[in-house]
Amino acid sequence: MTKSQKIELVSKLEEGFKASEAVVVCNYKGLNTKKLEELRNNAREMDVKVQIIKNTLASIALKNAGKDGMELKDTNIYLWGEDQLNVSKVADKFSEANQTFEIKTAFIDGEVASVDKVKALAKMPSRNELLAMLLQVWNAPITNFTIGLNALKEKKEAE
């Protein structure tokens, strides 16, 4: 890779990291190409970017994006996106399914986050799931009232 290509890659990564709410760094050592493609497909469905980047280039891009402080060692794959829940869910789900894939560190909410925080975020319901739960709670009294009225109507008709 030439120096100009590296500079271009760093600037593209910097833009992506700046626009993202979360960056998760994982160890992918031992994963075959088929598994990596599976990860990329899962990430694409959730609007999460996935890329294997040299640590030095990633370090420069993260620092320029204001997201430095993560310890970057060994073989890393980077996941980032605008929705921190989606990024966390993709990383956690894939790490549970594949023993060799492990979450190492992350940058969430303007700070370096632990693996436990990433896993906790992954367990949280998404915005759409929360809205569905809220609507279900709001509709429950009306639904129960309607069921009661129908039961009363049927009872009156039976008499």
Swiss-Prot record:
GO molecular function: large ribosomal subunit rRNA binding; structural constituent of ribosome
Domain of life: Bacteria
GO cellular component: large ribosomal subunit
BP term (GO), one: translation
Keywords: Ribonucleoprotein, Ribosomal protein, RNA-binding, rRNA-binding
Ligase in keyword set: no
A Pfam family hit: Ribosomal_L10
UniProt keyword Ribonucleoprotein, yes or no: yes
Function: Forms part of the ribosomal stalk, playing a central role in the interaction of the ribosome with GTP-bound translation factors.
Assembly, per entry: Part of the ribosomal stalk of the 50S ribosomal subunit. The N-terminus interacts with L11 and the large rRNA to form the base of the stalk. The C-terminus forms an elongated spine to which L12 dimers bind in a sequential fashion forming a multimeric L10(L12)X complex.
Protein name: Large ribosomal subunit protein uL10
Species of origin: Campylobacter lari (strain RM2100 / D67 / ATCC BAA-1060)
Classification lineage: Bacteria, Pseudomonadati, Campylobacterota, Epsilonproteobacteria, Campylobacterales
